[in-house]
């Protein structure tokens, strides 16, 4: 007889979903869905369709609902605002309605990008001030979850890394792709500060909070405060290519045609609540970066 608790994970086909499946699947009975069915453990669902989303969750009768999916490309959100708010805000509201009807907790993933970057660091109690439509749509989802769902877990991530070449659409894969394509000089911004977040550490810390039943809002990033430039230097070091590739620091304006969406100068989060509860198991970003490259990029560069 299967006595495992059941978790429904919506939007599970990306870099974060891959980590959540890996971390949770041994101890829980999972149903993982996505609009892009790219794994054998995924089934098809567009969570923007409220009726189908509700029916699918109700039929599974989970103990928890984890809503992962979102549009995270800032430029896409600026130029496709209707889709950005439909996906990042209204679908989250739908998830709250579903969780409340079933009387189960909801887990929502927010972002360090909801702050305006005027401060150097932000803890769990600092007031967000989102700059662009991606940040606004994500923060609107966060506010709704916090106000409308009694048992909620909101976890704010930083610069995500995870999933490897097929699923990582973020900074690490973009740098790795340039290296794979033979670039010998990389132009990297040195005026954007933040905190990397390894998907597997993030999923493990979410699992810990669920099992401890400490609901609420938590910053959840790797330790070690850094910036894009420093992350690239460390990546080149991990790859052993310090003598092969030149890293040239540039200002954000250098990339303004490709990356025109407004971004905060600092997205550095402090895991103050996790620290106070003694539940911060997020490791140093350098340790995680080395593990990530070793586990996901063997043979990638030839």
Language-model features, listed with the residues they occupy:
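NAD(P)H-binding glycine-rich loop region in Rossmannoid oxidoreductase-like domains
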Residues: 47-87
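Rossmann-fold cofactor-recognition segment
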Residues: 35-49
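Amphipathic terminal alpha-helices
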Residues: 284-302
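Mid/C-terminal beta-alpha module of Rossmann-like enzyme folds, strongest
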Residues: 205, 212-259, 300-301
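NAD(P)-dependent short-chain dehydrogenase/reductase
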Residues: 143-194, 200-208
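Catalytic helix-loop patch of NAD(P)-dependent Rossmann-fold dehydrogenases
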Residues: 86, 90-91, 114-155, 159-161, ...
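N-terminal Rossmann NAD(P)H-binding glycine-rich loop of SDR-like oxidoreductase domains
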Residues: 5-27
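NAD(P)-cofactor binding segment of oxidoreductase domains
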Residues: 79-107
């Amino acid at each position: 007889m299967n006595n495992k608790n059941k978790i429904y994970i919506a939007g599970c086909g990306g870099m974060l979903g891959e980590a959540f499946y890996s971390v949770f699947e041994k101890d829980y009975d999972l149903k993982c869905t996505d609009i892009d069915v790219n794994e054998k453990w995924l089934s098809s669902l567009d969570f923007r369709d409220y009726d189908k989303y509700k029916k699918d969750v109700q039929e599974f009768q989970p103990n928890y609902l984890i809503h992962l999916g979102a549009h995270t490309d800032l430029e896409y959100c600026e130029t496709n605002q209707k889709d950005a708010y439909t996906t990042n805000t209204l679908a989250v509201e739908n998830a709250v309605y579903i969780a409340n009807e079933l009387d189960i907790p909801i887990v929502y993933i927010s972002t360090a990008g909801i702050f305006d970057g005027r401060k150097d660091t932000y803890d769990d109690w600092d007031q967000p001030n989102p700059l662009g439509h991606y940040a606004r749509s994500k923060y609107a989802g966060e506010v709704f979850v916090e106000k409308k769902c009694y048992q909620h877990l909101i976890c704010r991530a930083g610069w995500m890394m995870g999933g490897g070449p097929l699923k990582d659409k973020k900074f690490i894969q973009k740098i790795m792709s340039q290296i794979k394509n033979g670039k010998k000089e990389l132009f990297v911004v040195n005026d954007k500060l933040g905190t990397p977040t390894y998907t597997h550490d993030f999923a493990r810390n979410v699992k810990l909070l669920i099992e401890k039943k400490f609901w609420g809002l938590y910053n959840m990033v790797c330790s070690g405060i850094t910036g894009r430039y420093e992350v690239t230097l460390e990546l080149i070091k991990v790859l052993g290519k310090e003598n092969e590739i030149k890293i040239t620091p540039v200002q954000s304006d250098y990339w303004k045609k490709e990356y025109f969406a407004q971004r905060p100068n600092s997205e550095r989060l402090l895991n103050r609540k996790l620290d106070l509860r003694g539940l911060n198991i997020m490791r140093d970003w350098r340790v995680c970066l080395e593990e990530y490259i070793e586990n996901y990029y063997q043979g990638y560069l030839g």
